[in-house]
Amino acid sequence: MGTIVLKMTAEQISVLQKDLASYATATKNPYAFFSAKVDGTSVIAYTSGKVTFQGAKPEILASRFGYQAEPKQSPDGQNLALIGSDEVGNGSYFGGLAVVASLVTPADHAFLKSLGVDDSKNLNDSKIRQIAPLLEEKIPHKALLLSPRKYNEVVGDGKAHNAVSVKVALHNQAIFLLLQSGAKPDKIVIDAFISEKNYQKYLKNERNHFEFPITLEEKAEGKYLAVAVSSIIARNLFLENLDKLSQEVGYTLPSGAGAKSDQVAAKLLQAYGDQALQTTAKYHFANTKKAYQRLK
Protein backbone atom coordinates (compact mmCIF):
# COMPACT_ATOMS: atom_id res chain seq x y z
CA MET A 1 0.00 0.00 0.00
CA GLY A 2 1.60 3.25 -1.15
CA THR A 3 0.64 6.84 -0.38
CA ILE A 4 1.33 10.02 -2.34
CA VAL A 5 0.46 13.48 -1.02
CA LEU A 6 0.20 16.47 -3.38
CA LYS A 7 -0.30 20.11 -2.43
CA MET A 8 -2.70 21.45 -5.05
CA THR A 9 -4.31 24.81 -5.83
CA ALA A 10 -8.08 25.28 -5.74
CA GLU A 11 -8.08 25.34 -9.55
CA GLN A 12 -6.12 22.07 -9.76
CA ILE A 13 -8.46 20.39 -7.28
CA SER A 14 -11.46 21.62 -9.27
CA VAL A 15 -10.03 19.95 -12.37
CA LEU A 16 -9.44 16.75 -10.38
CA GLN A 17 -13.03 16.77 -9.10
CA LYS A 18 -14.41 17.11 -12.61
CA ASP A 19 -12.17 14.39 -14.01
CA LEU A 20 -13.02 11.95 -11.22
CA ALA A 21 -16.67 12.91 -10.71
CA SER A 22 -17.92 9.56 -11.98
CA TYR A 23 -15.69 7.78 -9.42
CA ALA A 24 -16.76 9.90 -6.43
CA THR A 25 -17.37 8.16 -3.10
CA ALA A 26 -18.79 9.30 0.23
CA THR A 27 -16.39 10.41 2.97
CA LYS A 28 -17.01 10.96 6.68
CA ASN A 29 -13.64 12.61 7.24
CA PRO A 30 -14.41 16.08 8.67
CA TYR A 31 -11.35 17.56 6.95
CA ALA A 32 -12.15 16.23 3.48
CA PHE A 33 -14.58 17.60 0.90
CA PHE A 34 -14.09 15.14 -1.95
CA SER A 35 -13.14 11.50 -2.30
CA ALA A 36 -13.03 9.00 -5.12
CA LYS A 37 -11.78 5.51 -5.90
CA VAL A 38 -10.25 4.68 -9.27
CA ASP A 39 -8.93 1.20 -10.11
CA GLY A 40 -8.03 0.45 -6.50
CA THR A 41 -6.54 3.87 -5.74
CA SER A 42 -8.36 6.02 -3.17
CA VAL A 43 -8.24 9.80 -3.62
CA ILE A 44 -9.09 12.27 -0.87
CA ALA A 45 -9.03 16.07 -1.22
CA TYR A 46 -8.70 18.02 2.02
CA THR A 47 -9.73 21.56 2.90
CA SER A 48 -6.04 22.36 3.48
CA GLY A 49 -5.32 21.86 -0.22
CA LYS A 50 -3.63 18.49 0.25
CA VAL A 51 -4.74 15.59 -1.92
CA THR A 52 -3.81 12.01 -1.09
CA PHE A 53 -3.57 9.08 -3.47
CA GLN A 54 -3.43 5.71 -1.73
CA GLY A 55 -3.33 2.24 -3.22
CA ALA A 56 -1.08 -0.45 -4.67
CA LYS A 57 0.22 1.90 -7.42
CA PRO A 58 -0.95 5.43 -6.55
CA GLU A 59 1.67 7.05 -8.80
CA ILE A 60 -0.26 6.00 -11.92
CA LEU A 61 -3.28 8.14 -11.04
CA ALA A 62 -1.31 10.87 -9.25
CA SER A 63 0.83 11.44 -12.36
CA ARG A 64 -2.31 12.68 -14.15
CA PHE A 65 -2.47 15.56 -11.70
CA GLY A 66 1.11 16.76 -11.54
CA TYR A 67 2.94 14.08 -9.58
CA GLN A 68 6.52 13.39 -10.65
CA ALA A 69 8.34 10.44 -9.13
CA GLU A 70 11.41 11.34 -7.07
CA PRO A 71 14.59 9.28 -6.78
CA LYS A 72 13.94 6.31 -4.53
CA GLN A 73 14.51 7.02 -0.85
CA SER A 74 16.58 4.78 1.37
CA PRO A 75 14.51 2.51 3.65
CA ASP A 76 15.29 4.51 6.79
CA GLY A 77 13.51 7.56 5.35
CA GLN A 78 16.52 9.51 4.14
CA ASN A 79 15.64 13.16 3.48
CA LEU A 80 12.21 12.67 5.10
CA ALA A 81 10.84 13.85 8.40
CA LEU A 82 9.08 10.67 9.48
CA ILE A 83 6.65 9.79 12.25
CA GLY A 84 6.91 6.10 13.10
CA SER A 85 4.61 4.27 15.51
CA ASP A 86 4.92 0.85 17.12
CA GLU A 87 3.47 -1.12 20.02
CA VAL A 88 4.89 -3.56 22.56
CA GLY A 89 3.11 -5.86 24.97
CA ASN A 90 0.23 -7.08 22.84
CA GLY A 91 1.66 -10.60 22.79
CA SER A 92 2.49 -10.74 26.49
CA TYR A 93 0.02 -12.07 29.04
CA PHE A 94 1.44 -10.02 31.89
CA GLY A 95 2.04 -6.29 31.68
CA GLY A 96 0.38 -3.44 29.88
CA LEU A 97 0.21 -2.39 26.24
CA ALA A 98 2.63 0.37 25.25
CA VAL A 99 2.32 2.42 22.06
CA VAL A 100 4.79 5.13 21.03
CA ALA A 101 4.89 7.52 18.07
CA SER A 102 8.20 9.30 17.34
CA LEU A 103 9.31 12.02 14.94
CA VAL A 104 12.71 11.45 13.35
CA THR A 105 14.31 13.88 10.89
CA PRO A 106 17.41 13.37 8.72
CA ALA A 107 19.36 15.45 11.26
CA ASP A 108 18.76 12.69 13.83
CA HIS A 109 20.11 9.81 11.74
CA ALA A 110 23.77 10.06 12.76
CA PHE A 111 22.86 10.22 16.46
CA LEU A 112 20.54 7.23 16.20
CA LYS A 113 23.03 5.13 14.28
CA SER A 114 25.74 5.97 16.82
CA LEU A 115 23.54 4.34 19.47
CA GLY A 116 23.00 1.27 17.33
CA VAL A 117 19.28 1.91 16.99
CA ASP A 118 17.66 -0.99 15.18
CA ASP A 119 14.54 -3.11 15.45
CA SER A 120 14.11 -3.60 19.21
CA LYS A 121 13.46 -7.30 18.62
CA ASN A 122 17.16 -7.57 17.76
CA LEU A 123 18.23 -5.80 20.96
CA ASN A 124 18.35 -7.41 24.39
CA ASP A 125 16.44 -5.82 27.24
CA SER A 126 19.62 -4.55 28.89
CA LYS A 127 20.55 -2.56 25.78
CA ILE A 128 17.02 -1.24 25.43
CA ARG A 129 16.97 -0.03 29.05
CA GLN A 130 20.30 1.70 28.40
CA ILE A 131 19.48 3.63 25.24
CA ALA A 132 15.73 4.30 25.68
CA PRO A 133 16.26 7.23 28.11
CA LEU A 134 18.64 8.84 25.59
CA LEU A 135 16.03 8.51 22.86
CA GLU A 136 13.29 9.86 25.12
CA GLU A 137 15.38 12.96 25.83
CA LYS A 138 16.45 13.63 22.24
CA ILE A 139 13.58 12.51 19.99
CA PRO A 140 10.11 14.15 19.99
CA HIS A 141 7.60 11.42 20.84
CA LYS A 142 4.34 10.57 22.54
CA ALA A 143 4.12 7.44 24.67
CA LEU A 144 0.93 5.77 25.87
CA LEU A 145 0.64 2.87 28.31
CA LEU A 146 -2.61 0.98 28.82
CA SER A 147 -2.24 -0.75 32.18
CA PRO A 148 -3.59 -4.30 32.61
CA ARG A 149 -6.37 -2.96 34.86
CA LYS A 150 -7.52 -0.45 32.24
CA TYR A 151 -6.95 -2.94 29.41
CA ASN A 152 -9.33 -5.40 31.05
CA GLU A 153 -11.93 -2.67 31.51
CA VAL A 154 -12.09 -1.87 27.79
CA VAL A 155 -11.04 -5.07 25.97
CA GLY A 156 -13.17 -8.21 25.83
CA ASP A 157 -16.59 -9.55 24.90
CA GLY A 158 -19.25 -6.87 25.23
CA LYS A 159 -16.70 -4.13 25.90
CA ALA A 160 -15.58 -1.10 23.90
CA HIS A 161 -12.67 -2.82 22.15
CA ASN A 162 -11.22 -6.09 20.97
CA ALA A 163 -7.48 -6.82 21.01
CA VAL A 164 -7.02 -5.22 17.57
CA SER A 165 -9.27 -2.16 17.76
CA VAL A 166 -7.62 -1.05 21.00
CA LYS A 167 -4.28 -0.90 19.18
CA VAL A 168 -5.82 1.21 16.42
CA ALA A 169 -7.13 3.59 19.11
CA LEU A 170 -3.74 3.87 20.81
CA HIS A 171 -1.73 4.35 17.61
CA ASN A 172 -4.18 6.98 16.41
CA GLN A 173 -4.07 8.85 19.72
CA ALA A 174 -0.26 8.78 19.99
CA ILE A 175 0.14 10.14 16.46
CA PHE A 176 -2.63 12.69 17.01
CA LEU A 177 -0.93 14.01 20.16
CA LEU A 178 2.45 14.21 18.41
CA LEU A 179 0.94 16.18 15.54
CA GLN A 180 -0.86 18.43 18.02
CA SER A 181 2.47 19.17 19.69
CA GLY A 182 3.76 20.67 16.44
CA ALA A 183 5.37 17.72 14.66
CA LYS A 184 5.47 18.24 10.90
CA PRO A 185 6.21 14.94 9.15
CA ASP A 186 6.55 14.19 5.46
CA LYS A 187 5.26 10.69 6.08
CA ILE A 188 3.64 8.62 8.84
CA VAL A 189 4.36 4.89 9.12
CA ILE A 190 2.83 2.34 11.49
CA ASP A 191 4.29 -1.13 11.87
CA ALA A 192 1.47 -3.10 10.26
CA PHE A 193 -0.70 -5.27 12.51
CA ILE A 194 -3.91 -5.01 10.51
CA SER A 195 -5.07 -4.42 6.93
CA GLU A 196 -5.58 -0.86 5.70
CA LYS A 197 -9.30 -1.55 5.23
CA ASN A 198 -9.84 -2.76 8.80
CA TYR A 199 -7.66 0.00 10.25
CA GLN A 200 -9.89 2.59 8.61
CA LYS A 201 -12.99 0.71 9.78
CA TYR A 202 -11.93 0.87 13.43
CA LEU A 203 -10.67 4.44 13.02
CA LYS A 204 -14.22 5.65 12.34
CA ASN A 205 -15.02 4.95 15.99
CA GLU A 206 -12.32 7.30 17.26
CA ARG A 207 -13.02 10.83 18.46
CA ASN A 208 -9.74 12.40 17.37
CA HIS A 209 -8.81 12.49 13.68
CA PHE A 210 -6.08 14.09 11.58
CA GLU A 211 -5.91 14.64 7.84
CA PHE A 212 -2.40 13.31 7.23
CA PRO A 213 -2.50 9.82 5.64
CA ILE A 214 -0.80 6.90 7.33
CA THR A 215 1.08 4.00 5.78
CA LEU A 216 0.83 0.53 7.32
CA GLU A 217 3.98 -1.41 6.51
CA GLU A 218 5.05 -4.87 7.63
CA LYS A 219 8.36 -5.16 9.52
CA ALA A 220 8.62 -1.36 9.48
CA GLU A 221 10.75 -1.35 12.64
CA GLY A 222 13.57 -2.82 10.57
CA LYS A 223 13.16 -0.33 7.71
CA TYR A 224 12.55 3.05 9.34
CA LEU A 225 14.55 4.61 12.14
CA ALA A 226 11.46 6.41 13.45
CA VAL A 227 9.61 3.12 13.93
CA ALA A 228 12.70 1.55 15.51
CA VAL A 229 12.91 4.44 17.99
CA SER A 230 9.25 3.97 18.91
CA SER A 231 9.75 0.23 19.28
CA ILE A 232 12.65 0.74 21.70
CA ILE A 233 10.90 3.38 23.81
CA ALA A 234 7.73 1.26 23.91
CA ARG A 235 9.68 -1.85 24.95
CA ASN A 236 11.32 0.06 27.79
CA LEU A 237 7.95 1.42 28.92
CA PHE A 238 6.52 -2.11 28.88
CA LEU A 239 9.49 -3.48 30.86
CA GLU A 240 9.19 -0.72 33.46
CA ASN A 241 5.52 -1.53 33.89
CA LEU A 242 6.30 -5.24 34.22
CA ASP A 243 8.90 -4.43 36.90
CA LYS A 244 6.39 -2.29 38.81
CA LEU A 245 3.70 -4.97 38.72
CA SER A 246 6.20 -7.64 39.79
CA GLN A 247 7.13 -5.58 42.85
CA GLU A 248 3.48 -5.06 43.74
CA VAL A 249 2.61 -8.77 43.77
CA GLY A 250 5.95 -10.15 44.96
CA TYR A 251 6.42 -12.44 41.97
CA THR A 252 8.60 -11.97 38.88
CA LEU A 253 6.12 -11.61 36.04
CA PRO A 254 7.50 -13.01 32.77
CA SER A 255 7.15 -11.44 29.35
CA GLY A 256 5.37 -13.53 26.72
CA ALA A 257 2.44 -15.91 26.91
CA GLY A 258 4.03 -19.33 27.34
CA ALA A 259 3.97 -22.04 30.01
CA LYS A 260 5.97 -19.86 32.42
CA SER A 261 3.14 -17.33 32.37
CA ASP A 262 0.65 -20.11 33.17
CA GLN A 263 2.74 -21.16 36.17
CA VAL A 264 3.06 -17.67 37.60
CA ALA A 265 -0.62 -16.93 36.97
CA ALA A 266 -1.59 -20.06 38.93
CA LYS A 267 0.60 -18.92 41.84
CA LEU A 268 -1.06 -15.51 41.81
CA LEU A 269 -4.51 -17.10 41.83
CA GLN A 270 -3.53 -19.26 44.78
CA ALA A 271 -2.04 -16.35 46.70
CA TYR A 272 -4.42 -13.49 45.91
CA GLY A 273 -7.36 -14.77 43.89
CA ASP A 274 -8.78 -13.69 40.56
CA GLN A 275 -8.29 -9.97 41.17
CA ALA A 276 -4.51 -10.40 40.90
CA LEU A 277 -4.86 -11.40 37.25
CA GLN A 278 -7.29 -8.56 36.57
CA THR A 279 -4.62 -6.07 37.63
CA THR A 280 -1.46 -7.68 36.23
CA ALA A 281 -2.49 -9.57 33.08
CA LYS A 282 -4.56 -9.40 29.91
CA TYR A 283 -7.40 -11.45 31.28
CA HIS A 284 -8.94 -12.62 27.98
CA PHE A 285 -5.74 -14.50 27.01
CA ALA A 286 -5.94 -18.32 27.11
CA ASN A 287 -3.36 -18.27 29.93
CA THR A 288 -6.11 -17.39 32.41
CA LYS A 289 -8.02 -20.59 31.72
CA LYS A 290 -4.80 -22.63 31.80
CA ALA A 291 -3.87 -21.12 35.16
CA TYR A 292 -7.20 -22.14 36.65
CA GLN A 293 -6.78 -25.66 35.25
CA ARG A 294 -3.45 -25.93 37.09
CA LEU A 295 -5.27 -25.44 40.39
CA LYS A 296 -7.65 -28.37 39.90
Swiss-Prot record:
Enzyme class: hydrolase
InterPro entries: RNase_HII/HIII (IPR001352), RNase_HII/HIII_dom (IPR024567), RNase_HIII (IPR004641), RNase_HIII_N (IPR024568), RNaseH-like_sf (IPR012337), RNaseH_sf (IPR036397), TBP_dom_sf (IPR012295)
Family annotation (Gene3D superfamilies): Ribonuclease H-like superfamily/Ribonuclease H, TATA-Binding Protein
Major localization listed first in the record, in broad terms: cytoplasm
Biological processes, Gene Ontology terms: DNA replication, removal of RNA primer; mismatch repair
This enzyme's EC code(s): 3.1.26.4
Key word Nuclease present: yes
One Pfam family linked to the record: RNase_HII
Gene Ontology CC terms, in alphabetical order: cytoplasm; ribonuclease H2 complex
Binding site for a divalent metal cation: 86-87, 191
Localization: Cytoplasm
Recorded catalytic activity of this chain's protein: Endonucleolytic cleavage to 5'-phosphomonoester
GO MF annotation: an example: magnesium ion binding
All copies of domain RNase H type-2, residue ranges: 80-296
Entry keywords, A to Z: Cytoplasm, Endonuclease, Hydrolase, Magnesium, Metal-binding, Nuclease
Presence of the UniProt keyword Nuclease in the record: yes
Cofactor needs: Mn(2+); Mg(2+)
Note describing how the cofactor binds: Manganese or magnesium. Binds 1 divalent metal ion per monomer in the absence of substrate. May bind a second metal ion after substrate binding.
Function: Endonuclease that specifically degrades the RNA of RNA-DNA hybrids.
Family per similarity comment: Belongs to the RNase HII family. RnhC subfamily.
Protein known as: Ribonuclease HIII
